[in-house]
Design a protein with these regions (language model features):
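All-alpha prenyltransferase/terpene-synthase fold signal
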Residues: 1-225
Length: 225
């Protein structure tokens, strides 16, 4: 993100990036727990709870979340926009964002959910974490005037990312956004990618790298990221 605006990341910027990655990792560790998705494998290896037990997995996730905010607090000590970024990340990954999306998923009968509900869940569970990353980069680059564009980009990217996951996982037998869309799922994804490209072209930075990265994410042939 910073590179697209021609800026090199500072040490504080790298800590923000590491903090967001810690949040992503903690969310995967907790999502894999038996009380959540119950997945035994993650990235081709046993998930944390499968390898070390549920208690260790719960504590590992908690530790990663605390580490993320320790890193963000270090950045906030610099003042300026880093305190704003810390609040942004907390909001997007909390009850009204990523965690709220997980809760909404548990409240939903996924066997009968329609496309609108599944899209809402994806926008919260995945899109909000992506928004935290994208808008943080925008703020760090000094281009907060483009924050709305990056929010739109992240929201659409989160939904498209989930749709690609669903397309790759069609054989699981679970209801999903791809399942609801049926034969039109690939065309819907193509339309989302076109929309995302158009948003990137409207930003003031060099969008070539981010367009290539987005395409790689949404054209991937594995659901492991």
């Amino acid at each position: 993100m910073l590179g697209s605006y021609g800026k090199a990341p500072s040490d504080a910027d790298l800590k923000v990036a590491a903090a967001i990655e810690c949040i992503h990792s903690y969310s995967l560790v907790h999502d894999d727990l038996p009380a959540m998705d119950g997945d035994l494998m993650r990235r081709g290896k046993p998930s944390v709870h499968a390898a070390y037990g549920e208690a260790e997995a719960l504590l590992a996730g908690d530790a990663l979340l605390n580490l993320s905010f320790s890193l963000l607090a270090e950045c906030a000590c610099y003042g300026g926009h880093y305190a704003h970024i810390m609040k942004l990340v907390a909001d997007r990954c909390g009850a009204e964002g990523m965690i709220g999306g997980q809760a909404l998923e548990f409240e939903t009968d996924l066997r009968t959910a329609d496309a609108a509900r599944l899209t809402e869940i994806a926008g919260l569970k995945t899109g909000m974490l992506m928004e935290a990353a994208a808008v943080s980069g925008c703020i760090a680059a000094g281009r907060e005037d483009e924050a709305d564009l990056w929010r739109e980009y992240a929201h659409k990217l989160g939904i498209a990312f989930q749709l690609r996951d669903d397309i790759l996982d069609r054989g699981s037998g679970e209801n999903s956004l791809a399942g609801v869309l049926g034969a039109g799922a690939e065309a819907e994804l193509d339309g989302m990618i076109a929309d995302i490209d158009e948003i990137l072209l409207r930003t003031g930075g060099n969008s070539e790298f981010l367009r290539a990265l987005t395409s790689a994410m949404l054209r991937r042939t594995t659901d492991e990221v």
